[in-house]
Amino acid sequence: NHGLFTWADNAYDCYMNSLEVIERCSEYLEEHVAQKPVFGGQKVTSLAAEDRKLQAATLAPYLRGLCSSEQLMVGHFTDSDRVLEFINSHALDKLAPMGTSCPDHFLRTKIRPLVLNFTPDEDVSDAEKVKEKLTPLFEDYRASYKDYYENHKHPNSPAMRDANPVVILWPGVGMFTFAKNKQTARVASEFYVNAINVMRGSEAVSSYTSLPLQEAFNI
């Protein structure tokens, strides 16, 4: 869960060892990725790029409003091929709730994302209907986060932080991330893409295992 350690007689050789091991691991994973459908294959078909941007731009203000229930948040959106490969897949429902496997990822993205039960071409033009559908999803996420906190806290644990999601996934459209400023939201997006890469490689050679909840909380 923490990374790679390599050893040598000096710093340069140690660095070169790290690069070599990383390259060999990358080649090994890609060989296995090519042997079967990634994430079990695609379940959802993405909208065209222009339509994805339009859907995201329409929904983003509603998501931002709900994510800002405790403090003002700024959003970031990405619909890269790697993100779409994951959020459109058959494995999304299994992998997304499991959470991330690396402490660095978890600290930036929270324990798990919120997955929207919207179709890619969902009509998001009616404000009241959109809020009516989104609000229960956020309420469930907040309740789940509160349960996670209550079940794993220690006597000296700090107060529960903002219970709203950082990462929000919309199959067929893309990924939103929310944080206190644009840079932090963008970094959260990059970290979740890294988490996707970990899940992708793990599922190619074996089965993905997330960070144990208590260990995640202790971080």
Residue ranges with predicted function:
Residues 1, 9, 16-219:
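Domain-length cofactor-binding catalytic modules of enzymes
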